Amino acid sequence: MHLSLLYRGRLSSCNYACDYCPFAKTYDSPAALRRDAQDLARFVGWAQAQTRPLSILFTPWGEGLVRRHYREAMVQLSQLPQLRRVAIQTNLCTGMRWLDAANLDRLALWCTYHPSQVTRAAFLRRCQALRDRGVRHSVGMVAAHAHMDEIEALRAALPDTTPMWLNAFDPRPPDYYTPEQVQRLSRIDPHFSYNLAPPPSFGAPCLTGESVLSVDGDGTVRRCHFVDTPLGNLYDGSFATQLRTRSCPNARCDCFIGYAHRPDLPFQADYAGGVLERVPATA
């Protein structure tokens, strides 16, 4: 059975300082970084020993690709025949040479543009470098009021073949977006409404806990990042007996890496083959 794993280790540092993010300009101690690297190496070793097909998305609390151990893990995992996809969420601030050693048939990047931290021109140059190398990727932004024009400018500057997604600004008051703004944003990302006003989740079918799992640095397995109940451990194999169909226990799920795994919503079809990296099937 194919498993999709969302890995989030101990890393909690970022080189950017976005004012809405709790991890802005935070720093990990050398000891914390060493432990994170050790944990990640253990996870890669586990994946190397598997025979079942796997897909992996790294969802760090911060920026992973500025750390060599994440770049090396991406390269190593991309070489495994059992890996369908390895992807990571990134601000795309690092150089590209590490990609030379990767198998680009299996690697993808989920890229976020932060206008307060980097110029549009610089970010677009990095996107062009990805296209030149043939790296599969998506591009997106947080849809803050201050960035409405920038969102449209970025979309206009990107080729139609580059998918662009949007996350609703959070936290926000109920009337944060006008109907006209929602229409503008939905023209950029037709799925924006699911992030803005997700349908109720409690009791809804979900692939998490069955074929999609969350893994932390200790190897503790949970069904997703938003349900804290452990299902066992990755490394002793105890999680395997807990894999089964489950409905969502939460009243609301407003994050793509959660609700995209609901089969009653359009994402499994619309993003077939690209759910983890947020690339639609038509891209």
What are these regions (language model features)?
Residues R42-W61, L65, C255, A283:
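Short Fe-S-cluster ligation motifs
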Residues Y20, T208, N250:
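Short, cysteine/histidine-rich loop/knuckle motifs that typically chelate Zn2+
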